[in-house]
């Protein structure tokens, strides 16, 4: 079954421009992490455009979602529990008794209520030693189920910058490291969670996990992602398990991004110490679609850089370089899964597509019609063709610039293919909150 897309409506207007800018920024940040050849310096991605030609979509199968899509991480566990699992707590007093409704602006109402609950008519007094200390805000009862978890600050997501988009990708869950222990582990009784010191002996202490649900010390560190948005548990180059770069990026519950979760892994930590994978409950309304995606359009991407000349001395002068990707040809199987207000998206490699859908997927004629086990098929990339134009130097005083520099073009195309396959091809996937 084919699907028609209103491409102009989806890619134009303020929303389309914002999405294009986020994609440009994502690709730019990825290029900043690349080790450049000695003769290239300062790569900048200056523009991105969706073009005017839409992709062709054809639904091939409908099935249950991949198990990786059900895996939770500690960052999204808090929001999940606040949305669906945590019932609203009844207000309680400091002794754990249920508090009846009372008017806060009525003089003496709280004191009268407490006297009635405790069964005496004398004036209400605090226990000895607490008259002047008061109740610590961190120890007072807090209904975290009513707090929007996205109001807490988060670190910048290594894809779409700013942390405000509706895109996210995830990194694979791995081991724990020192103080960067995930919140879920602390709540289960980690030996590192000593709790708050009890300055009031009569009051039971609360652990850090109860009062700092999203602090910098309780969340897994994302510093090693290069501080760059959109995951999947983006398993771009790590353990082939769900992450998630979905973890593009705070706002409302709709259109919210989940940050990537990639805790640092200790090389000497035994595998038995790794936390077990926590899976969401499968529901009957969850579904997954395999969709063949073919594209031969005029999508464009512009980059600038400098080429260094070593004559008469190393890095003697830099020449401006401009690269324009003017279109590409693409043929792959997309996976779209819907699981409780989350849409997970990725592409399948040619080998996985052959195994799940059949060898006819991705065969567009010519060399692509080889048998699945043919050695010539293995290196096949999802990006079949990328058209690029390059220009070195500036046209000044009638002088012509040097165009179509093959060595530089080859390097840029290799990096574009690598970024695409690491960030978009399963087991990497992106998560959208809807």
From Swiss-Prot:
* A Gene Ontology cellular-component term: ERMES complex
Which keywords are on file for this protein?
Endoplasmic reticulum, Lipid transport, Lipid-binding, Membrane, Mitochondrion, Mitochondrion outer membrane, Transport
Question: Where would you say this protein principally sits, based on its record?
Answer: mitochondrion
Residues annotated as region Disordered? Answer: 70-141, 181-275
Name of one Pfam family that matches: MMM1
Give GO terms for biological process.
mitochondrial genome maintenance; mitochondrion-endoplasmic reticulum membrane tethering; phospholipid transport; protein insertion into mitochondrial outer membrane
What does UniProt say about this protein's domains? The SMP-LTD domain is a barrel-like domain that can bind various types of glycerophospholipids in its interior and mediate their transfer between two adjacent bilayers.
Family membership, please give it: Belongs to the MDM12 family.
What's the protein name?
Mitochondrial distribution and morphology protein 12
Q: Which organism is it from?
A: Blastomyces gilchristii (strain SLH14081)
């Amino acid at each position: 079954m084919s699907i028609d897309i209103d491409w102009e409506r989806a890619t134009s207007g303020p929303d389309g421009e914002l999405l294009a800018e986020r994609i440009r920024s994502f690709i730019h940040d990825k290029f900043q992490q690349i080790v450049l050849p000695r003769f290239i310096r300062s790569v900048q991605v200056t523009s991105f455009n969706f073009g005017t030609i839409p992709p062709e979509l054809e639904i091939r199968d409908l099935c249950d979602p991949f198990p990786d899509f059900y895996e939770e991480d500690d960052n999204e566990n808090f929001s999940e529990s606040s949305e669906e699992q945590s019932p609203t707590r009844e207000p309680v007093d400091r002794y754990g008794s249920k508090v009846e409704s009372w008017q806060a602006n009525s003089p003496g109402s709280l004191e009268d209520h407490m006297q009635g609950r405790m069964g005496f008519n004398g004036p209400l007094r605090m226990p000895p030693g607490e008259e002047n200390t008061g109740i610590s805000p961190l120890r007072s009862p807090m209904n975290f189920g009513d707090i929007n978890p996205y109001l807490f600050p988060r670190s910048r997501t290594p894809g779409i910058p700013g942390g405000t988009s509706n895109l996210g990708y995830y990194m694979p869950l791995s081991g724990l490291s020192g103080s960067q222990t995930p919140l879920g582990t602390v709540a289960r009784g980690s030996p590192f969670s000593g709790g708050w010191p009890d300055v009031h002996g009569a009051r039971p202490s609360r652990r850090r996990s109860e009062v700092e649900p999203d602090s910098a010390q309780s969340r897994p560190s994302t510093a090693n992602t290069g501080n760059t948005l959109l995951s999947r548990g983006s398993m771009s180059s790590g353990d082939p398990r769900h992450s998630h770069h979905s973890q593009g990026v705070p706002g409302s519950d709709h259109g919210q991004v989940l940050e990537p979760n990639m805790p640092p892994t200790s090389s000497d930590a035994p595998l038995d110490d790794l936390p077990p994978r926590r899976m969401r409950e499968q529901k009957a309304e969850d579904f997954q679609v395999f969709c063949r995606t073919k594209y031969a359009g005029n999508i464009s991407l512009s980059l600038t850089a400098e080429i260094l000349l070593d004559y008469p001395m190393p890095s003697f002068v830099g020449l401006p370089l401009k690269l324009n990707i003017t279109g590409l040809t693409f043929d792959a199987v997309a996976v779209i899964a819907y699981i409780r207000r989350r849409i997970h998206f990725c592409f399948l490699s040619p080998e996985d597509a052959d195994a799940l859908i059949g060898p006819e997927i991705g065969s567009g004629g010519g060399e692509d019609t080889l048998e699945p086990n043919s050695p010539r098929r293995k290196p096949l990339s999802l990006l079949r063709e990328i058209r690029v134009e390059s220009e070195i130097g500036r046209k000044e005083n009638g002088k012509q610039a040097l165009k179509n520099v093959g060595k530089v073009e080859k390097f840029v195309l290799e990096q574009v293919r690598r970024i695409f396959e690491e960030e978009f091809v399963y087991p990497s996937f992106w998560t959208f909150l809807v």
